[in-house]
């Protein structure tokens, strides 16, 4: 695991804030966040959807300097306040900008958004002092042979191919760098980064992969054969998928955003040519987070 050096930032920073719009009670943490940032003299920008949710729906007074429209914005750091889903949406908006993203967890599990509301004050003191780390997380790219996707073709967590409009399984012919691997008879197939290995991939039996492992996990969803198991490959290898379905279509989900493809569509999945920068507290250790979130060693008898 690489040793990450602290990043020294200027005293006055510009923060771009993204949040979810369906947790009214937990949105009170946003007020504390604004208070901390203004105390540091920071410039606050906010996505318009979150701003309207706080001001129009919750009647909050929000001290913002500018509203963000679309994906055309600049900032020293992006703050995602919500769960991992909110973090993924923020990462999609950041795209290739290489702006580091800090996740404040007001959701449930939170592997990406792992700073608790109780840790906000000390975390921003550390950021002000330059005592934090930035981790580079790999991204997957999806290419279709016959169409352009309506959503972004990039995934920080995973790309999933799933059945649609039928209870019958789909058939997914899978090749790695042109070499035939297997034809999966299953409800779907999940292609995950190390970051995504603790998300959907884990729930369907995929392996937990340490960040910076430079790998991709391929895990079937409810396979027909008990002999089929997940496989981990290098992330500089290319995956090609050809799908057959009784409904003649299938679903592609990219970090939770989905759309329908025809079974004539061939999918190519490869590592993207950019990464997402994730802000972590300087004393952050992945294994501590893993042990805590997965409750390893917890004894319910006590």
UniProtKB/Swiss-Prot annotation:
Locations listed in the record: Cytoplasm
Protein EC: 2.7.1.23
Chief location category: cytoplasm
Membrane spanning stretches: none
Catalytic function, reaction form: NAD(+) + ATP = ADP + NADP(+) + H(+)
Keywords linked to the UniProt accession: ATP-binding, Cytoplasm, Kinase, NAD, NADP, Nucleotide-binding, Transferase
Pfam family, one: NAD_kinase
Residues binding NAD(+): 84-85, 89, 157-158, 187, 198-203, 222
Example GO biological process: NADP biosynthetic process
InterPro entries: ATP-NAD_kinase_N, ATP-NAD_kinase_PpnK-typ_C, NAD/diacylglycerol_kinase_sf, NADK
Name of the molecule in the record: NAD kinase
Organism: Bacteroides thetaiotaomicron (strain ATCC 29148 / DSM 2079 / JCM 5827 / CCUG 10774 / NCTC 10582 / VPI-5482 / E50)
């Amino acid at each position: 695991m690489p040793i990450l050096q602290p990043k020294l930032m200027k005293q006055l920073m510009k923060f771009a804030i993204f949040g979810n719009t369906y947790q009214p009670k937990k949105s009170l943490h946003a007020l504390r966040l604004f208070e901390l940032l203004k105390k540091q003299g920071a410039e606050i920008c906010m996505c318009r959807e979150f701003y309207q949710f706080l001001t129009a729906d919750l009647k909050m007074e929000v001290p913002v300097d500018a509203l963000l429209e679309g994906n055309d914005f600049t900032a020293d750091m992006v703050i995602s306040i919500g769960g991992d889903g909110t973090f993924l949406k923020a990462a999609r908006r950041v795209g290739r900008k290489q702006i580091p993203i800090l996740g404040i967890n007001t959701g449930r599990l939170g592997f990406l958004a792992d700073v608790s509301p109780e840790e906000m004050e000390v975390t921003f003191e550390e950021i002000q002092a330059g005592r934090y780390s930035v981790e580079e997380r790999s991204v997957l790219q999806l290419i279709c042979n016959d169409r352009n996707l309506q959503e972004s073709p990039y995934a920080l967590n995973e790309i999933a191919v799933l059945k649609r409009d039928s209870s019958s399984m789909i058939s997914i012919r899978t090749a790695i760098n042109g070499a035939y691997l297997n034809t999966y008879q299953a409800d779907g197939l999940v292609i995950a980064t190390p970051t995504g290995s603790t998300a959907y991939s884990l729930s369907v039996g995929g392996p937990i992969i340490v960040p910076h492992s430079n790998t991709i996990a391929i895990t079937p969803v409810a396979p027909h054969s008990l002999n089929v198991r997940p496989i981990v490959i290098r992330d500089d290898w290319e995956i090609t998928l050809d799908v057959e379905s009784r409904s003649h279509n299938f679903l592609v989900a990219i970090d939770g955003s989905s759309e329908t493809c025809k079974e004539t569509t061939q999918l190519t999945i490869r590592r993207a040519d950019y990464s997402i920068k994730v802000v972590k507290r300087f004393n952050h250790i992945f294994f501590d987070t893993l042990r805590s979130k997965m409750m390893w060693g917890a004894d319910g008898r006590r």
